[in-house]
Amino acid sequence: MNALHFGAGNIGRGFIGKLLADSGVFVTFADINQTQIDQINQNKQYGVKIVGDASRVEVVKNIAAINSKDEEAVIEQVKSVELITTAVGPNVLGFIAPLFAKALAARLEAGNTQPLNIIACENMVRGTSFFKAKIFENLTDSQQAEIEKFVGFVDSAVDRIVPPAELNEADPLEVTVEEFSEWIVDKTQFKGQIPDIKGMELTDNLMAFVERKLFTLNTGHLISAYLGKQAGVKWIKEAIAIDSVKAAVKATMEESGAVLIKRYNFDPQAHAAYIEKILKRFANPYLNDDVNRVGREPIRKLSPNDRLIKPLLGTLEYGLPHKNLVNGVVMALQYRNEEDPQAVELAQFIADNGVAAAVEKYTGLTNQEVIDQVVALYN
């Protein structure tokens, strides 16, 4: 089986690309980093350093790479592969959608109507459905109808902490990852036979898993980063070692967890164990996870479908406590990082228009009581 994977960054190499290659899939990475592309094509392998109680390096083989700016090369791949995955970041999906539209149209014209499945492995809710909508903006109604027949747009939930690691001179492509990984896909959205990939779990209730991960791992990670930054530490593991930070992170995840328990009928004890597992992952002494990396892009993280506002809206829907989630929103608004364009834009908007206007613009919150709480805490 041949797959095209967009994004040869840490997640691409250390998580999705590795699972595919481990399952005997030949993986072609598409990226804009020509140095990395050359290294993949020259070395034809790279190491994945899995860190935890028993660290080890596993070698990934059966790989090649192309430059995603080379439209012809991308189109040729899309015309023939059986699976396409992405790990490019939510913001990039919209940029690559026109090329995907052109490539899928070319596959159609070439007469290849074999099933093709596309899975966006991004930190967003129903990322593949979003990607599909962006692709379809660039196609005619008749092209869309034909593509719908043989292309499956499969939503997924992904979870693995893959922070940047020090360069290994002997293997510049080596990537460091935690032991834990979770890749859950919506089995109802595939076209043709579902590929047999070790580590890819199938479900017909994806939203429960998407929101479990978003409301717990992503929410907790972000709160750890903001509190860690306020405490003056560099790494998530240092932040979570501070008792008051750990308590606040846990309390926030319990608030968002109450929404999940109500919405999806999760077992409270099982979810409490899931929270403890995540706290342990944050404390992994072998992972250097920078608080600025985790805290970056506050505008995206304040959006209505992301890790702060979505669970907060859930607490309002079910009449549940949300004090810690409101604190999270305040910390996102207070996040300052001169090297992060979104942080700069947010700070400027608040300076020009005030906190209440920023809450309205970026979060979509309409509950006046909550908006007033955010403004009061911010000031």
From Swiss-Prot:
A GO molecular-function annotation: mannitol-1-phosphate 5-dehydrogenase activity
Signal peptide range in chain numbering: none
HAMAP family listed in its UniProt record: Mannitol_dehydrog
Pfam name, any one: Mannitol_dh_C
Name of this protein: Mannitol-1-phosphate 5-dehydrogenase
GO biological process: mannitol catabolic process
Recorded catalytic activity of this chain's protein: D-mannitol 1-phosphate + NAD(+) = beta-D-fructose 6-phosphate + NADH + H(+)
Database matches in PANTHER family: ALTRONATE OXIDOREDUCTASE-RELATED, MANNITOL-1-PHOSPHATE 5-DEHYDROGENASE
Keyword annotations of the record: NAD, Oxidoreductase
Lineage: Bacteria, Pseudomonadati, Pseudomonadota, Gammaproteobacteria, Pasteurellales
Keyword field contains NAD: yes
EC code(s) of this entry: 1.1.1.17
InterPro entries, A to Z: 6-PGluconate_DH-like_C_sf (IPR008927), 6PGD_dom2 (IPR013328), Mannitol_1_phos_5_DH (IPR023028), Mannitol_DH (IPR000669), Mannitol_DH_C (IPR013118), Mannitol_DH_CS (IPR023027), Mannitol_DH_N (IPR013131), NAD(P)-bd_dom_sf (IPR036291)
GO cellular component, one term: cytosol
Protein family per UniProt: Belongs to the mannitol dehydrogenase family.
Binding site for NAD(+): A3, L4, H5, F6, G7, A8, G9, N10, I11, G12, R13, G14
